[in-house]
Design a protein with these regions (language model features):
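Nucleotide-sugar donor-binding/catalytic module of glycosyltransferases
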Residues: 1-160
Length: 160
């Protein structure tokens, strides 16, 4: 059975320091098929050029790089979603990473139950801060008052 495409969308703004690590974490995934859509949001540093170099280095067509005038991460993220072809959308900020098993495990959960609308995992800090990022346990009432779901979570494209 053919596995569904996962579209990883990444807004990029002055993220030269972390971008390669974020992209490498996606490429190192044990899941296929993936597409990685990078939208540079008017970076003043070398982020856009680095993104282009990473796409060329991957040489698989999996990474697509776009540029827009600075409009903020939400606009860049939504633009990336408009370009995405995957059944599933996974936003990943340019200063974040994803584990190698996440996509396979998240797709399995979502394919097994159409009622599941979002899949996310525990998170850890890296860089200057270390340790576990303590997320509140999921509850509908808490979600209505305070979003405890991190941006790096998998959604059905049809629900975006």
């Amino acid at each position: 059975m053919e596995k569904p495409l996962v579209s990883v969308i990444m807004p990029v703004y002055n993220a030269e320091e972390y971008l390669e690590e974020a992209v490498d974490s996606v490429i190192a995934s044990n899941y296929s098929p993936l597409e990685l859509i990078l939208v540079d949001d008017g970076s003043a540093d070398r982020s856009y050029h680095l993104a282009q170099q990473l796409a060329e280095k991957a040489d698989t067509g999996v990474i697509k790089v776009y540029k827009q005038p600075n409009a903020g991460p939400c606009v860049a993220r939504n633009y990336a979603v408009s370009l995405a072809k995957g059944k599933y959308i996974f936003p990943l900020d340019a200063d974040d990473r994803v584990g190698p098993d996440f996509f396979a495990e998240a797709v399995d959960v979502m394919e097994a139950d159409n009622g599941v609308k979002v899949v996310y995992s525990h998170a850890e800090f890296f860089g200057e801060r270390t340790g576990e990022w303590k997320l509140a346990p999921y509850s509908r009432s808490l979600l209505a008052r305070k979003n405890m779901i991190p941006i790096s979570a998998m959604y059905r494209r049809s629900d975006w």
